[in-house]
Amino acid sequence: MKVLISSLLLLLPLMLMSVVSSSSHTGVARGQRDQRQASGRWLREGGQECECQDWFLRAPRRTLMAAPRLTKPCPCDHFKGRMKKTRHQRHHRKSNKPSRACQQFLTRCLLESFALPL
């Protein structure tokens, strides 16, 4: 019984990685596909990379600490702060959830941290 449970726990990260990797490329334009790289790095337009550990070592959310070697921000660095709403903007509120690029970056980082070395 213990062997069965332990083998299932070992296979779970592999199944998650295969599901995420197959679903991340469906419906994506060819030009956007080149922006992604494996191993937790996010290739930006300038050719610089943002790594998972760089992001998780930063200060808490909404207090951005720019690393001195990075000139462009990571996908999750862009945050639109709360601004005073005018009459027309009150009805079109955006939620404070991160962008799609940031969500993809963070899920990739979390999956890599769960993956066990084989």
Swiss-Prot record:
Gene Ontology CC terms: extracellular space
InterPro entries, alphabetized: CXCL17 (IPR029183)
Signal keyword on record: yes
Keywords: Angiogenesis, Chemotaxis, Developmental protein, Differentiation, Disulfide bond, Secreted, Signal
N-terminal signal peptide: 1-22
Localization: Secreted
Protein's GO biological process: angiogenesis; cell differentiation; macrophage chemotaxis; negative regulation of inflammatory response; positive regulation of ERK1 and ERK2 cascade; positive regulation of macrophage chemotaxis; positive regulation of monocyte chemotaxis; positive regulation of vascular endothelial growth factor production
Disulphide bond pairs: C74-C102, C76-C109
PANTHER family referenced in this protein's UniProt entry, alphabetically: C-X-C MOTIF CHEMOKINE 17 (PTHR37351:SF1)
Membership in a protein family: Belongs to the intercrine alpha (chemokine CxC) family.
Cited function: Chemokine that acts as a chemoattractant for monocytes, macrophages and dendritic cells. Plays a role in angiogenesis and possibly in the development of tumors. Acts as an anti-inflammatory in the stomach. May play a role in the innate defense against infections. Activates the C-X-C chemokine receptor GPR35 to induce a rapid and transient rise in the level of intracellular calcium ions.
Protein name: C-X-C motif chemokine 17
Lineage of the organism: Eukaryota, Metazoa, Chordata, Craniata, Vertebrata
